[in-house]
Amino acid sequence: MDRFYVISNSMKDPEGKIAKEIKAYLNFRGKQCIIQERQGKESLRSYKYTNANLIPDDTECILVVGGDGTLLQAARDMIERNIPLLGVNKGTLGYLAEVDGDNMEEALDRLIDDNVVIEDRMMLEGCAYSHKKKLLQDFALNDIVIARSGRLQIIDFNIYVNGEFLRSYSADGIIISTPTGSTGYSLSAGGPIVSPEASLILLTPIAPHTLNTRSIVLPADA
């Protein structure tokens, strides 16, 4: 790989120190590297960490400096671009962002030498409707959660798969998870761990009000 782009979470790397170190090392190795300019207020943007339209078309890899949350959000921002992402951990969790300061140069060397395995990860698209009107639409690399809030005590869910009724849940919420998300919220709610490269969807109830309720595993095209 020869052309790189760096996205940095300003809360995790406030001075851009890690991003600058990455750029300096890649330049030392004779490679191109662009650091994304710091963005304006999130409330004024349609994206959170990066504007996918500003990333050069010839970019071969995007390095995301932050924690797992930063990487998950960057994947959502980059949904329309087919560019590999690599997380550089500066957060409290580093399950997805595997690179840290101790092995950063080694990881960059492997990228430069094309000595890497690129994993394809599935994503979810979720839409919320009210009275047949679409309220919102978004994407997720890990999971989509529908949960109670405020004084709402319990939610009755009717689950349909491809238009066919599957079952009902009475629970505090439900987690629709990808394989990537199977080790997150879904796992803490009693869901199974599956290979991150699998092609399937997990449905896991949150605090179900029956004792024999378990997660459901569905095909990816459900």
Name each model-derived stretch.
Residues 1-54, 93-175, 183-222:
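Catalytic phosphate-donor-binding core of small-molecule kinases
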Residues 62, 85, 174-175:
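Short, well-ordered beta-strand core segments
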